[in-house]
A protein has these predicted regions:
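Extended alpha-helical targeting/anchoring segments
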Residues: 1-545
Length: 545
């Protein structure tokens, strides 16, 4: 992949075209793209941009403690693949981070951070090989262009940040962290019905890449597509439907976890904890069709589809983990804790009544306040003095099955002491998926849950070339592998929690994922409340499993 004795420089080419007929999903299907990132809201519809990684250049994985460069399925240890580049001079000049005796990157030494060799630091070295968007004179600099890699950071990555041990077995076979570095990108601008085609090469690639020719070829290929030929409805798989729950946390098992957490809270060891239930669901519905169903019935700020060949990650998360953007050399970041849940009402009047009930529920508000304070504390770890503020508080957001209380915390990064990735470390994992105090809650979760969380509860999103970032919490998501969808959902437990109510909350949250495994006609006709898999019309299990 790389030859550090060559002098091939990073290149970028861009073309903007009219696009008022094709959709991101149809292009993903027709051209077998690797990644789709979208954003939409129940009240306002889809967001301005959608992003497709059409073809990949390479991947970076963390697997069993080793970092790999993956090219066309072949894994090479990262330090070996980048051997000619990992010099103290190169790394210090481009990244401003410490280097160990063998020339491999270490975490920045800072208050509260460890100094072990880190995945995010090594990912940053790879990111330095990407071209800068400014190299293309007509490329709008505000486009969401993930030149720093798009992918996920698994929940157990927290062991790199703090001295916590994870020993539970995995449910499926996937790396702890995985990022795709794109070769060709499509950015849909829905506001102006425009499409930006971008192709890139990376520094020191062995083979010279004609990025302008790639852009022209992609533009021509898109012109030949039409709505009919790129429709999922034209495939036999679109008629598949149904599912079978093969394994799931029982109501008794979950309520026992809640009781043990409440006992720890009573003893003063915890303030809050977020246990999850797991579910393995077999279904003939292919993951792209499942994603299509999910986005149709549950539009969310973070909708994602990642095809890693051996497995697929799809989801519709409502919750930001961290969004960081730099302007005039000042980096601001947002965290949006979501805590406090009610099911949606069957009518507008019932929905409003449930909203009022939620906002006046002492237990839910206490839970939300604890996690809001935790987010403020996490933001404060890497912010300048006085740089943390709550910019929105106790707002209600609605989704297909549930409504939530949401607040927003903003921080200003202390860039003299911290790298941008340190803000992600400070937020990871989100308090809404762990609890408070964070380390004690994570240790409690590890002792109670029987399997590794993996993607669930981690971060999913992308870095730009300058290490700005946009990551969601990996919830309302599924990992698909070998015909099985692996799902999880959790609920925040405090001293006043009712075990049965917490279990039912996890069922409400996971129901949107089960709904996506219905036939296409059912989803389009809104028949997502029909009985299936032993559930009642609200999608809740009748009694214990």
């Amino acid at each position: 992949m790389f030859d550090f004795y060559t002098h091939n420089k990073p290149q970028i080419a861009h073309k903007e075209v009219l696009c008022d007929s094709l959709t991101p999903l149809s292009v993903l299907f027709a051209l077998k793209a690797k990644v789709l990132l979208e954003s939409a809201y129940n009240e306002t519809g889809k967001d301005r941009y959608s992003l497709v990684i059409l073809n990949e250049a390479f991947r970076v994985y963390k697997e069993e403690g080793i970092h790999y460069l993956v090219v066309k399925g072949v894994k090479t240890p990262l330090h070996q693949a980048l051997q000619g580049y990992l010099t103290s001079e190169n790394i210090k000049k481009s990244l401003g981070i410490r280097v160990d005796s063998v020339g491999f990157a270490e975490s920045r030494e800072s208050k509260g951070a460890d100094s072990k060799q880190g995945f995010l630091e090594n990912l940053a070295i790879v990111r330095s090989l990407a071209p800068k968007p400014e190299q293309s004179p007509h490329l709008p600099l505000d486009l969401p262009l993930p030149l720093g890699g798009a992918g996920y950071i698994g929940y157990e990555f927290f062991a790199e940040i703090e001295n916590v041990e994870f020993s539970n077995p995995p449910l499926y076979n996937a790396p702890e962290c995985g990022f795709i570095f794109g070769r060709d990108f499509l950015i849909f601008d829905h506001l102006f019905d425009r499409l930006h085609i971008v192709s890139v090469s990376y520094a020191y690639e062995k083979e010279a890449i004609d990025v302008a020719e790639r852009v022209a070829s992609i533009a021509k290929k898109l012109e030949s597509l039409n709505v009919a030929s790129s429709s999922l409805e034209s495939t036999p798989d679109s008629q598949a439907q149904g599912y079978e729950i093969q394994n799931a946390t029982s109501q008794k098992e979950y309520e026992t976890m809640v009781e043990k957490i409440k006992d720890s809270i009573y003893k003063g060891d915890l303030l809050q904890c977020v246990p999850s239930q797991s579910m393995q669901v077999k279904s003939p519905i292919p993951p792209l069709q499942a994603y299509r169903n999910l986005r149709h019935q549950n539009p969310s700020p973070y909708m994602f589809y990642y095809d890693f060949d051996d497995f697929v990650i799809l989801g519709a998360s409502p919750e930001i983990m961290i969004r960081l953007k730099t302007s005039d050399e000042i980096s601001h970041f947002i965290m949006r804790p979501i805590a406090g849940t009610r099911p949606r009402g069957k009518s507008v009047a019932e929905d409003l009544e449930l909203e009022k009930e939620l906002l006046n529920d002492e237990k839910e508000n206490a839970e939300h306040l604890m996690l809001l304070d935790l987010a403020r504390n996490d933001a404060g770890k890497v912010s300048v003095g006085g740089g943390v503020s709550v910019i929105a508080r106790n707002k209600i957001e609605r989704y297909s099955r549930v409504m939530h209380i949401v607040s927003s915390v903003q921080g200003e990064l202390d860039s003299k002491r911290f790298a941008k990735r340190d803000a992600l470390k400070a937020a990871f994992p989100a308090g809404t998926l762990s609890g408070a105090p964070k380390i004690a809650a994570i240790e409690m979760i590890e002792s109670l849950e029987s399997t590794r969380r993996g993607v669930y509860g981690g971060a999913i999103g992308y870095f730009t070339q300058n290490e700005d970032m946009d990551f969601a919490i990996a919830i309302r998501s599924a990992v698909y592998q070998n015909g099985v969808y692996y799902m999880r959902s959790g609920a925040g437990v405090v001293q006043d929690s009712n075990p049965r109510a917490e279990y039912l909350e996890t069922q409400n949250k996971i129901q949107s994922l089960l709904d996506m495994l219905r036939g296409q006609n059912e989803v389009e006709q809104g028949k997502v409340k029909q009985n299936n898999g032993g559930r009642n019309e609200k999608g809740l299990k009748e009694g214990a499993e």
